[in-house]
Amino acid sequence: MMKGQLAGLMKQAQQMQENMKKMQEQLAQIEVEGQSGAGLVKVTMTCKNDVRRVSIDPSLLADDKDMLEDLVAAAFNDAVRKAEATAQEKMGGMTSGLPLPPGFKLPF
């Protein structure tokens, strides 16, 4: 490999690293909301999986504890899926053009 090509690759890698750092900071600010029980339980979290809020409709507090626990878990899982999808969408542009194998996931 020529010296100029190597320098170009190093510069490209450094720029990508800077862009990824900026995107990570942005993802920490983006909030998604997961729901279950037709919106009776809501979990709001960032795309970095930091939970910001859990909202439980008061009508559920007198109900079955097991059902409430299941609804909270389902809302949390819904929020995680939405956070992952949003992160993949936002980060997808950064990896386009890279020769990565299909299905390869970088640690976002």
Swiss-Prot record:
Gene3D superfamilies: Nucleoid-associated protein YbaB-like domain
Biased composition (Pro residues): 99-108
Sorted UniProt keywords: Cytoplasm, DNA-binding
Pfam families in alphabetical order: YbaB_DNA_bd
InterPro entries named among the record's database cross-references: YbaB-like_sf, YbaB/EbfC
Residue ranges, annotated region (Disordered): 87-108
Cell compartments where the protein resides: Cytoplasm, Nucleoid
One GO cellular component term noted in the UniProt record for this chain: cytosol
GO MF annotations in UniProt: DNA binding
UniProt keyword DNA-binding present: yes
PANTHER family, alphabetized: NUCLEOID-ASSOCIATED PROTEIN YBAB
Membership in a protein family: Belongs to the YbaB/EbfC family.
Function field: Binds to DNA and alters its conformation. May be involved in regulation of gene expression, nucleoid organization and DNA protection.
Subunit record text: Homodimer.
NCBIfam families membership: DNA_YbaB_EbfC
Protein's name according to its UniProt entry: Nucleoid-associated protein Bphy_0952
Organism of this sequence: Paraburkholderia phymatum (strain DSM 17167 / CIP 108236 / LMG 21445 / STM815) (Burkholderia phymatum)
